[in-house]
């Protein structure tokens, strides 16, 4: 016979009636259930946008379940690998070695070397104080022909600071090299989808002979690197703003944040920002 060993759950703090729920946080931010389903897109979908690259996740089984299923759902299992972290690895204090040797084993077993590896470290690396610089330095020494992109799957950090998604949308552009800008090129950062050909921004830029570079239209690794040639960096997606601004500062480029809007006045204001930045004639509502 089963016997209750704890106290009966008091619904007072465990339940909130709809009429009493307050926006934006109806529940106290304490111990929470982590649902295995978070919506349509996650960091695996986003990382798969990088051409000629693979993703490697170093984490425990429970954390792996969602990302590996995403790769399978995308029919992209050939671009996805993982290194399973077990309890003994944490207790023995050798998580750096497990990460390095695990990634090395994955790459040695591949028939080819990808142009880049999006290497995702996780919460455990934070908990045990792993030396991430040592990990990446050693991997870059072993595989000088591969670009290792520093990515994170650390949802413990979502209560403050940048989310894993924001950090990923910055990291994907870290390989962009310093170069002289092309006066007739504009680069668009941080989006999940390429701008539609009928969009105001793209029609305006095409009208004046500008090349628009976007990650979603890049077919090769070199196409991605060529995004640094843009004289102006744009972002239209909130989660990509941090990454775009960071790369613009690093590469000394002018940048604009033009988020999607359904307000005519705001749209006109954004188009004016764009024309002013490029020195183009102001757009009229009739144009």
Where are these regions (language model features)?
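An N-terminal assembly and electron-transfer interface module characteristic of large anaerobic redox
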Residues: 1-287
